[in-house]
């Protein structure tokens, strides 16, 4: 099961404080791998920190390089690679289906988690949110 693999390979290794949940496609069904992973903000931050650090705790150096280097430009002119968005050079951004964000700024040694419950039709809002997260990250240092 996907949830068991995720627990063993990531959740336990980052030292998550809380159990996470994953929506399934039906009663006793399979996890929706494309979405619907639910966790506490501090545990999302742990994942962001682990991916941003040089530690191979949850991902190899080559996998981290793949995540951090956009291969295509998509919406808003952002780069994209392997489920990771790149709204600005050097910035990594994981986005959930309804407004969950894990923003990584290695230059400022910052990870910001933003949890939301937004409609999927909130077009254009991600660009504004990324801009605010960038401003917060740059001002904190």
Language-model features and meaning:
Residues 1-34:
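Active-site helix/loop module of the DD-peptidase/beta-lactamase fold
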Residues 1-7, 54-62:
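Structural helix-adjacent loops and short alpha-helical linkers that scaffold large soluble proteins
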Residues 2, 35-39, 94-96, 121:
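Extracytoplasmic/periplasmic, Sec-exported soluble proteins
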Residues 7, 11, 45-52, 68, ...:
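Non-transmembrane alpha-helical segments in soluble domains
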Residues 10-18, 41, 48-55, 71, ...:
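Sec/Tat-exported extracytoplasmic proteins
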Residues 17-23, 65-119:
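Active-site Gly/Thr loop motif
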Residues 35-56, 100-117:
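Active-site-proximal alpha-helical segments within enzyme catalytic domains
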Residues 122-141:
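Short, gly/Ser/Thr-rich active-site loops of penicillin-recognizing serine hydrolases
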């Amino acid at each position: 099961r996907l949830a068991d693999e995720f627990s063993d390979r990531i959740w336990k290794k980052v030292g998550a404080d809380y159990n996470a949940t994953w929506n399934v496609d039906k009663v006793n069904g399979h996890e929706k791998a494309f979405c619907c992973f639910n966790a506490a903000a501090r545990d999302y931050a742990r994942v962001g920190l682990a991916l941003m650090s040089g530690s191979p705790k949850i991902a190899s150096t080559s996998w981290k390089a793949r995540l951090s280097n956009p291969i295509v430009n998509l919406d808003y002119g952002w780069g994209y690679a392997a489920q990771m968005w790149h709204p600005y050079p050097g910035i990594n951004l994981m986005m959930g289906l309804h407004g969950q964000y894990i923003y990584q700024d290695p230059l400022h040694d910052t990870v910001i988690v933003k949890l939301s419950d937004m409609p999927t039709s909130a077009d254009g809002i991600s660009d504004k949110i990324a801009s605010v997260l960038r401003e917060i990250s740059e001002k904190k240092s």
